[in-house]
Design a protein with these regions (language model features):
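Metal-dependent phosphoester-hydrolase catalytic domains
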Residues: 8-23, 28-40, 44-61, 70-73, ...
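A fold-wide structural signal in alpha/beta-hydrolase
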Residues: 102, 210-212, 353-355
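Active-site metal-binding loops of divalent metal-dependent hydrolases
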Residues: 106-108, 142, 216, 283-284, ...
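N-terminal, active-site-proximal structural segment of metallo-dependent hydrolase catalytic domains
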Residues: 1-155, 171, 263-264, 358-359
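Active-site environment of divalent metal-dependent phosphoester hydrolases
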Residues: 110-115, 144-148, 169-173, 194, ...
């Protein structure tokens, strides 16, 4: 304390206490109902910022006055579940067992905005999928027309004998390509203008697997909204941040409330399934620290948390760097080597894949 003086020490400790409280609010925000409290439910988006601040306070107090480091340390310990979810570390990599299947989920951004697929210039999304060696592929923003037709997509993925395409609204759709028989495909009932979920039953090695492919409610941010956010990041003056924050938080909160109802519907479907294994995947349009992720993942394991490493950022544009694409597995299934694959840049999302085997 002698290095900074007693007065400033108490001031910094008070600020530290506020940062710990805010960290805990963010860490436990998935338990806040977005319908009742839409703004507060978005607190999880700020989790990494308050995590970094508390880590800095921890280091600072360890150097200046170790006794006060206990405050941030306790805050971090109480947030360990959220930290593990947001930034998993899996040092020991298990070998993929024989008989495991490779599962892949990808928001294709309309196959790179309906880029043509020709012999001399193949569509990079289709090339990636064709060479992925995945056994089951779930696609979001399956939008065709103009330069790329569904027939061409099916031909490019002709190694998959079983396929299903479902148009959600307008041109937007969801698709599934599988090496295993797709027994049925039904929409999950919930309100949405342009998004949706499809539940497939797939026969895999004698067992019936429930696969739920999701594209949950988007945040409806226009290009103007995204430009406001980019300007805030480039030049964060007080007026820009104040005006921009109100605009963005309002839209995020509104979308969060809609997704909450959708998440509840998916959770009911999963809870009522009495068959074999369950895989819930797709674009959740929400961070790992959210009501959506918690409710949809109730009773399931997050494949990336179980066998991935790092942030796993799957949305890659407009400075909104979050892991919003997921693969969740029932307790009788285990994931291996879950990867958010940033080697392909053809969409505003990166694909996420993992190997899946029975325990």
């Amino acid at each position: 304390m002698k290095y900074i003086g007693r007065f400033w020490g108490w001031i910094l400790l008070g600020i530290n206490l506020c940062m710990v409280v805010l960290l805990l609010v963010c860490a436990y925000s998935p338990y806040i109902d977005p319908v009742a409290h839409p703004v507060w439910s978005c607190a999880g988006l700020a989790f990494p910022a308050f995590l970094i601040v508390n880590l800095l306070f921890l280091v600072f107090w360890l150097v200046i006055y170790r006794k006060y480091a206990l405050l941030s340390f306790l805050g971090l310990v109480c947030s360990i579940g959220a930290i593990r979810t947001y930034f998993p570390v899996n040092v020991f990599v298990s070998d993929v067992p024989e008989g495991a299947i490779k599962f892949l989920s990808y928001n294709t951004m309309a196959f790179e905005k309906n880029r043509a697929n020709t012999k001399d210039n193949p569509n990079p999304v289709l090339e990636y999928l064709r060479n992925s060696n995945a056994d089951i592929i779930c696609l979001q923003e399956y939008i065709v027309g103009g330069r790329l037709t569904k027939k061409e997509v099916d031909y490019a993925l002709r190694d998959y004998p079983y396929k299903n395409y479902h148009k959600i609204s307008g041109a937007n759709g969801l698709g599934c390509y599988s090496r295993f028989p797709i027994l049925s495909a039904h929409p999950v009932k919930y309100a949405s203008l342009n998004n949706g979920s499809i539940a497939y039953k797939i026969k895999v090695n004698g067992d019936t697997l429930l696969v739920v492919n999701n594209h949950l409610e988007s945040n409806k941010l226009t290009e103007k909204d995204k430009e406001v956010y980019r300007e805030m990041m480039k030049d964060p003056d007080k007026q820009k941040v104040s005006q921009g924050s109100r605009l963005l938080i309002g839209k995020l909160a509104e979308a969060s409330a809609i997704r909450a109802v959708q998440a509840d519907s998916i959770a009911r479907l999963v809870a009522g399934y009495k068959g074999g294994g369950i895989i819930v995947c797709g674009d959740f349009n929400d961070s790992p620290i959210s009501y959506t992720h918690r409710v949809v993942g109730e009773g399931l394991n997050d494949a990336f948390v179980e066998s991935g490493n790092g942030f796993g950022i799957s949305y890659n544009q407009n400075h909104f760097y979050f892991r919003i694409d997921n693969i969740l597995l029932s307790k009788n299934l285990k994931s291996y080597r879950c990867t958010v694959d940033n080697t392909i840049k053809s969409s505003d999302h990166y694909p996420i894949w993992c190997y899946v085997a029975e325990k």
